[in-house]
């Protein structure tokens, strides 16, 4: 069986180095280096670090614009999810959360008619496209800052960058 080959570019961002991975046609992920679920699902596939790549250059342009404080529509960017049908359903829902706005895990569970907000949290945590599919816009009960695969301090930075409102957790 032939091994799949992926291209990888690293992107320095205000929240840490991002690992961007695609094949010739699809974006497979944007991960903060060493986050939970880092490069999940790629297995023993060949990943080659490259200096340029058409899909990844489109993502870099988006990230540059995002970190400068504005957004662009990337709905036509070809995403290739590696996950369960349930996870894919949650990730599709996340894409509709507008810049600078938030929603709770419980509200997503209610909207998707899922009994458990924790199940939603698990799927949100395995989102392979940090920032692009905005899992950082999902908050806990009472709009509290909770879980983020690369750390809640990075989630707080992204939400503040977007001007979103949230409740800090008391220590």
Model-assigned labels for residue ranges:
Residues 1-114, 161, 165-171:
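Basic nucleic-acid-binding alpha-helical/helix-turn surface characteristic of O6-alkylguanine DNA
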Residues 119-120:
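Helix-turn-helix DNA-binding helix
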Residues 124, 128, 132:
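Major-groove DNA-recognition helix of helix-turn-helix-type DNA-binding domains
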Residues 132-139:
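Short Lys/Arg-enriched helix C-cap and helix-to-coil transition segments
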Residues 141-171:
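…primarily DNA-binding HTH/wHTH and HhH modules…
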């Amino acid at each position: 069986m032939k091994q799949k080959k992926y291209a990888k570019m690293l992107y320095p961002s205000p929240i840490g180095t991002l690992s961007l991975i695609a094949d010739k046609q699809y974006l497979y992920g944007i991960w903060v280096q060493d986050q939970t679920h880092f490069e999940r699902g790629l297995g023993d596939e060949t990943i080659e670090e490259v200096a340029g790549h058409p899909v990844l250059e489109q993502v870099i342009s988006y990230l540059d614009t995002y970190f400068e404080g504005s957004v662009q529509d990337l709905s036509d960017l070809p995403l290739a999810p590696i996950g369960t049908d349930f996870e894919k359903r949650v990730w599709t829902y996340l894409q509709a959360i507008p810049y600078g706005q938030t929603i709770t895990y419980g509200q997503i569970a209610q909207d998707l008619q899922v009994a458990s907000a924790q199940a939603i949290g698990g799927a949100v945590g395995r989102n392979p496209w940090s920032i692009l599919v905005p899992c950082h816009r999902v908050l806990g009960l009472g709009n509290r800052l909770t879980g983020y695969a690369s750390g809640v301090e990075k989630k707080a930075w992204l939400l503040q960058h977007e001007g979103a409102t949230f409740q800090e957790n008391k220590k």
